[in-house]
């Protein structure tokens, strides 16, 4: 389906400003200059036209997948090399939980929900949202460095993925959530 040996960067979510897709596309353009065997997969629905225009120069390295079934999504989690969530706002993200369940290294922002869910995360994978004239901004440079680190350092990426899988088992598996639910109501 994709090129042999391609590194797959996976974004899953709505296509709108709050999810940071525009920053991701800009950062990805920098990544492929240094790691040309990399592909960005964008799964989700929304208005693609803006993002297609943004990615005109790199369209051959981006695959816009659209909305898909949960089973198909799980197949993408299994083949992806990294999950990226450059969101400006998240609460309890099912996408983050699913990515951790599949042992993906994640690149996240320091927005409240994600920081609480993935508190062990290596600092190099956590992007800092900065306020600029009452508007939150994300550093494209920081994001591209994080992406490049994961797609070029397989050993480190595997270790971060293992930490995420452990975090999933310790806090978000069905058994752990059932126990927490029972404890809360007893």
Residue ranges and their predicted role:
Residues 67-68, 75-80:
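Short alpha-helical donor nucleotide-sugar binding micro-motif in glycosyltransferases
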Residues 3-19, 25-28:
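Conserved donor-binding/catalytic core segment of Leloir-type glycosyltransferases
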Residues 9, 24-28, 40, 143, ...:
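A structural motif in glycosyltransferase catalytic domains
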Residues 149, 156-170:
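A short, well-ordered alpha-helix in the C-terminal region of glycosyltransferases
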Residues 88:
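Aromatic "clamp/platform" in nucleotide-sugar-dependent glycosyltransferases that forms part
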């Amino acid at each position: 389906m994709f090129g042999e040996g391609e590194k797959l960067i996976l974004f899953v979510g709505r296509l709108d400003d709050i999810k940071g897709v525009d920053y991701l596309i800009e950062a990805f353009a920098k990544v492929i200059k240094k790691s040309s065997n990399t592909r960005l997969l964008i799964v989700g629905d929304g208005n693609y036209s803006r993002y297609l225009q943004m990615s005109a120069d790199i369209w051959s390295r981006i695959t816009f997948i659209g909305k898909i079934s949960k089973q198909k999504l799980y197949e993408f989690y299994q083949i992806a090399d990294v999950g990226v969530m450059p969101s400006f706002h998240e609460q309890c993200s099912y996408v983050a939980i699913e990515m951790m369940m599949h042992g993906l290294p994640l690149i996240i922002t320091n927005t409240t929900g994600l920081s609480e869910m993935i508190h062990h995360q290596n600092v190099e994978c956590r992007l800092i949202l900065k306020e600029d004239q009452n508007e939150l901004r994300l550093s494209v440079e920081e994001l591209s460095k994080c992406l490049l680190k994961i797609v070029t350092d397989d050993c480190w990426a595997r270790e971060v993925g293992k930490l995420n899988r452990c975090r999933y088992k310790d806090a978000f598996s069905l058994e752990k959530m059932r126990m927490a639910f029972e404890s809360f109501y007893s």
